[in-house]
UniProtKB/Swiss-Prot annotation:
Stated name of the protein: ATP synthase subunit alpha
GO cellular component term, pick one: proton-transporting ATP synthase complex
Family affiliation: Belongs to the ATPase alpha/beta chains family.
NCBIfam families referenced in this protein's UniProt entry, alphabetically: atpA, PRK13343.1
Gene: atpA
Length: 545
C-alpha cells in the first residue's frame, strides 16, 4: 500500500485558490403569513412583518389582496376578488409590488374592471406600461392655470358655468335628475375634436361607473357607441355586484389610466359616476377593518379619500407637456340637501359645482341646472370670447326673472318693465332647454343666446322657441357664413352682430308670415280688436281694517 504524503504548501495553495474563486450564493428569505379570519371581502393575516402599505398579497388559491391595516401582530387585507375560497390557516405570500394597472392607447373603446382586466369579451388588451393606483398629485410648480375651454355642448353650462381643461367641476343633485346625462353629453360633445386629428384638440375620455347596475353600464356603453364616442372612451366598471373593495379602487384605476395620457401631453376628461357610492364602499371596508367610525359612520380620512383622488386632475405646465385631466365627479344628494357630509366635502375640494334641482327636472326644464346655486370658480378664464360677450348678462337676467316670478304670484298688477322681465325670462328658460344626447357646437350656442339676451325672441311664443331656434340655425347654416366665422374666430364683433341682426329680422318675417303682427302665422288666427266697452272688467278693492 502506497504511503500517503500531504504537503502543507500544496494544501495552503489549494485553500487560497478556492477562497479567491469562491462566490457566496444569494440568501433568500421568504415571508409566509397565515389567514386567521376571512369573510365579507376582508381577511386578517398574521405574520409578514415586512409588508408595505398597499402591497399586493397572494392567497393560496391565487386571489390577490391589498394590505391595509398594518397592526403589530396582524394585517387587515382587502380581498380583490372572490373570497369564498379563502379559509383560516391558508398561507399568504408577499408579491413585493404595490397595486398598479396597465395603461395605454389600447384601452380606448374598451370596458375594464378596476384592475385593468377587460370584461367586454373583446380579447386581451396590449398595455404600453403599468402605473401605480396611488400616485402623488402634481405639485404647485408643475401646474398651470386653467385657460382652455372644455365644451360640454350644453347651453346652460357653457354660457353660465363654463368648464376649463384641468378643472374639477362637481355635478350634484338628487337621483334621477340628469347627472349622468350631463356627463355623457359632455363625452359625446368631444367627437368633433377627436375627428379633427389635432392632438391639442383631442380629448380622451374615461367613464368610471361605481356601484351601478350592470344593465345601466351596458346601456351607457351602447349610447356612446351609437353616438360615435366609444372610440375615444374607456369605461372602468365596478357594478353593484362587485365587492366593496373594487368599488373603492375603481376611481383610482380610472385616474391612473388618465394620468398616463396627461403626462404624455394629451387632454383627458374623466367622469366619476358617482363618488357617493365610493364613499359608502370605503365606509363598509373601514368598518369591516374595525377602524374607528366618525360622522355618519364614515372613517376619519374620508375627506382625504376624495381630495387625493380629485387633486390628480390638473392642467400641467409647459415643461411637463401641457397635458390636462378634467374631472367631473358626481354626487347624489338626499332631498336636495347639499349640506350633508360627503357633498360638503367634495364641494370644498372641487373648483365649482353644477346643482341639478329635482323641481326643475319635474317641471320639464332639462338640463335641470339651478343657476342660482351653481358656480364655476375658474372656468370663466377658459370661456371663449364670443360666448363671454353674449352671456355676460344672462345669469343676472335669469336671477331677476326668478325673483319677479315669485313676486308676480302674489301681485295682481305689474308695470311694463316687470312684464318685460317675465316675458324675456320665460323665453330664456325655454331657450336653455336641450334634448339628451344632442350637444350644440359653441357657435350655435352663441347665436341662440345672443338672440335671447338681445330681445329678438321676445315676440316669439314660448311654445315656438325651440322650433324657431332650430330653423334659424338651419337658415344660417345654408344661407350665411356667420356660423363658420364664429367657429373660426370665436369673436362676436360689431360686423358679426349686425349681420346676425339683419338675418334674424329677415328670418322672422318668413317664420311668422308677412305683416306687422308677428304672432299671426301657422297656428295663430287673427282677430279684430275688441272695443273696451264690450269687455267685462272686475275691479278688486282692498280695504284696510
Amino acid at each position: 500500500m502506497a504511503e500517503l504524503t500531504i504537503n502543507a504548501d500544496d494544501v495552503r495553495i489549494a485553500l487560497n485558490e478556492f477562497a479567491a474563486s469562491y462566490e457566496p450564493g444569494n440568501a433568500e428569505r421568504v415571508e409566509v403569513g397565515r389567514v386567521t379570519t376571512a369573510g365579507d371581502g376582508i381577511a386578517r393575516v398574521e405574520g409578514l412583518p415586512s409588508v408595505m402599505a398597499n402591497e399586493l398579497l397572494r392567497f393560496e388559491d391565487g386571489t390577490l389582496g391589498l394590505a391595509q391595516n398594518l397592526d403589530v401582530r396582524e394585517i387587515g387585507v382587502i380581498v380583490l376578488g372572490d373570497f369564498t375560497g379563502i379559509e383560516e390557516g391558508q398561507e399568504v405570500h408577499r408579491t413585493g409590488q404595490v397595486l398598479s394597472v396597465p395603461v395605454g392607447d389600447a384601452f380606448l373603446g374598451r370596458v375594464v374592471d378596476p384592475l385593468g382586466q377587460p370584461i367586454d369579451d373583446l380579447g386581451e388588451i396590449k398595455a404600453e406600461t403599468t402605473r401605480a393606483l396611488e400616485l402623488q398629485a402634481p405639485g404647485v410648480t408643475q401646474r398651470k392655470s386653467v385657460h382652455e375651454p372644455m365644451q360640454t355642448g350644453l347651453k346652460a353650462i357653457d354660457a353660465m358655468i363654463p368648464i376649463g381643461r384641468g378643472q374639477r367641476q362637481l355635478i350634484i343633485g338628487d337621483r334621477q335628475t340628469g347627472k349622468s346625462a350631463i356627463a355623457i353629453d359632455t363625452i359625446i360633445n368631444q367627437k368633433a375634436n377627436w375627428a379633427s386629428g389635432d392632438v391639442t384638440k383631442q380629448v380622451r375620455c374615461i367613464y368610471v361607473a361605481i356601484g351601478q347596475k350592470a344593465s345601466t353600464i351596458a346601456a351607457v356603453r351602447q349610447t356612446l357607441e351609437d353616438n360615435g364616442a366609444l372610440e375615444y372612451t374607456t369605461i372602468v366598471a365596478s357594478p353593484a355586484s362587485d365587492p366593496a373593495g373594487f368599488k373603492y379602487l375603481a376611481p383610482y384605476a380610472g385616474s391612473a389610466i388618465g394620468q398616463h395620457w396627461m403626462y404624455g401631453g394629451k387632454h383627458v376628461l374623466i367622469v366619476f359616476d358617482d363618488l357617493s357610492k365610493q364613499a359608502e364602499a370605503y365606509r363598509a371596508v373601514s368598518l369591516l377593518l374595525r377602524r374607528p367610525p366618525g360622522r355618519e359612520a364614515y372613517p376619519g380620512d374620508v375627506f382625504y379619500l376624495h381630495s387625493r383622488l380629485l387633486e390628480r386632475c390638473a392642467k400641467l405646465s409647459d415643461e411637463l407637456g401641457a397635458g390636462s385631466m378634467t374631472g367631473l365627479p358626481l354626487i347624489e344628494t338626499k332631498a336636495n340637501d347639499v349640506s350633508a357630509y360627503i357633498p360638503t366635502n367634495v364641494i370644498s375640494i372641487t373648483d365649482g359645482q353644477i346643482f341639478l334641482q329635482s323641481d326643475l327636472f319635474n317641471a320639464n326644464q332639462r338640463p335641470a341646472v339651478d343657476v342660482g346655486v351653481s358656480v364655476s370658480r375658474v372656468g370663466g378664464a377658459a370661456q371663449v370670447k364670443s360666448m363671454k360677450k353674449v352671456s355676460g348678462t344672462l345669469k343676472l337676467e335669469l336671477a331677476q326673472y326668478r325673483d319677479m316670478q315669485a313676486f308676480a304670484m302674489f301681485a295682481s298688477d305689474l308695470d311694463a318693465a316687470s312684464r318685460q322681465q317675465l316675458t324675456r325670462g320665460a323665453r330664456l328658460m325655454e331657450l336653455l332647454k336641450q334634448g339628451q344626447y344632442s350637444p350644440f357646437p359653441v357657435e350655435n350656442q352663441v347665436v341662440s343666446i345672443w338672440a335671447g339676451t338681445n330681445g329678438y325672441l321676445d315676440d316669439v311664443p314660448v311654445e315656438d322657441i325651440s322650433r324657431f331656434e332650430t330653423e334659424f340655425l338651419e337658415h344660417l347654416k345654408h344661407k350665411s357664413s356667420i356660423l363658420t366665422t364664429l367657429a373660426q374666430t370665436n369673436v362676436m364683433d360689431d360686423d358679426t352682430a349686425e349681420a346676425l341682426k339683419t338675418s334674424i329680422v329677415a328670418f322672422k318675417k318668413g317664420f311668422f308670415g308677412e305683416g306687422d303682427n308677428l304672432l299671426v302665422g301657422a297656428g295663430h288666427e287673427e282677430y279684430a280688436p275688441i272695443d273696451e266697452a264690450q269687455v267685462d272688467q272686475e275691479k278688486i278693492v282692498k280695504q284696510k281694517r
